Amino acid sequence: MKLKQIALGVFAALLLASCGNKANEPEAKTQTSDTWQEIKPQEIDVNAVKMFADDWMLLSAGKDTSMNMMTIAWGGLGELWGKPVVTIYVSTDRYTYKFLEENEYFTVTAFPEQYRDKLQYLGSVSGRDEDKVKGSGLTPEFTKLGNPIYKEANLAIECKKLYAEPLNKDLMPLEQRQWYDEKKQGVHVMYIGEIVNVWKK
């Protein structure tokens, strides 16, 4: 009988000790898909041609009080003057052009395929005519520098403008010159931005 009582006592002590240790352990930190992870520009592991041309990206400029966004397929990633850069092309006719001219920074964000219809919408309407944030249903977030990215995105690249230059129609191949003439639209401006921050999910 005494042996049973001793055994039960030892078991209870071990059980209490085990529970006490677990109570003192720090909770495990979990990373969810809703949490941004900061990475280096060199760690952007994507096919840039596919990301722009096929999947599309969302270009945004401005601050929380006044901003605009548009879907883009013309662009690229690379290096200039020893800096990692994003290059984009925006027509002077686009409403976003005004925001690019007035602000020092811009962002480009990529989205999962399920948001394709949102990008289609954002590339087909103008912020002059309607509230594109409300119409798209996307959720703007703002970086420490005050620039817009989106909760639904899975890659966000924040850029500081380095250089801007309108494309020269006289230097274009004939086919491209005719394209601009037929569409009767403003020429595209090339913007090169230094990548200052990158986040992914």
Residue ranges of each PLM-predicted region?
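Bacterial N-terminal signal peptides that target proteins for export
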Residues: 1-7
